[in-house]
Amino acid sequence: MTLQTRRTFLATLGVAALGIASGTAEAAGTALAQRRKLKKVGLQLYTVRDMMKADLPGTLRKVAAAGYKEVEFAGYFGRTPAQIKELLKKNGLTSPSSHIGLDILEKDSVRAFADAKAIGHQWVVVPWLPEERRRTADDWTAIVTLLNQLGPQAKAAGLRLAYHNHDFELKPVGGLTPYDMMLTETDPALVDFEMDLYWVTFGGGNPLDYFNRFPKRFPLVHVKDSAGPPDNKMVDVGKGKIDFRAIFAQSDKAGIKHYFVEHDQPADPLATIRTSARYLTTLRY
């Protein structure tokens, strides 16, 4: 090969290599752009409960301005269903679900479900169990029975019943794990689950394991982050150790439809919801 031919060959090779590199980079960029993102980011309003108590209309405006499209209620602060529905509409928000205490449902489930339906909720979520109702295996059997009784009532009202976990459901009682028992013994046609990703992780569970063992049972999730060991304190979403990309990548298997940011004790609630919304709206998985 002559010197000139060699130079021409190497120049051509260089151009080709640049083309390959450029194509690879472009393909990588396209692949990244095509990765999934959350269509809507929601907020559990317990995060801003003090703000809601002081100024409910103003708080909903700030929530919408922070980028949230959906909210989950934890109390209505004296407003009627019609007033709540109007405030949601005014701020361009929807509210797929609400946390309603088991005591309220036991006292008057007909009214609770009717009010939820009037607001436009699709799910009524049992948010918590007092300690005296979860001490023994028999207590948990009674809770499962109650959920299976409330489920048909919710369905008759045009709603779905769901249960929200903390960490105590993952602590063995009488040789069983209550969370596993609930998932196994409640009727999937009538009872859904809202997985709190922080509390499952805090309790030693693995969200992906539950998605694999109980597919399509988790239409709702609470997205809250953990600083990790040793104290596992709650932090703003995206500032901690929970691998949301890995979790969200299994959303189809889990059946997740709605993602609600939550922080139980934020130092600055407004800053927390803004930081968390920014992270989730830019997250690709």
Enumerate the language-model features and the residues they cover.
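N-terminal secretory signal peptides and thylakoid transit peptides that target proteins
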Residues: 1-17
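Acidic (Asp/Glu)-rich catalytic clusters
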Residues: 32-36, 61-65, 79-95, 108-121, ...
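Acidic-and-aromatic substrate-binding clefts and catalytic sites of carbohydrate-active enzymes
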Residues: 49-53, 72-82, 101-108, 131-135, ...
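Gly/Pro-rich active-site loop or hairpin
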Residues: 60-61, 170-176, 199-257, 265-271
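Active-site acidic/histidine proton-transfer and metal-coordination neighborhood
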Residues: 14, 70, 94, 102-193, ...
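Hydrophobic faces of well-ordered beta-strands that scaffold small-molecule active sites
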Residues: 39-44, 71-73, 95-100, 124-126, ...
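Conserved, mostly hydrophobic/aromatic
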Residues: 43, 63, 71, 88, ...
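C-terminal segment of N-terminal export signals and the immediately downstream linker at the start
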Residues: 24-53, 62
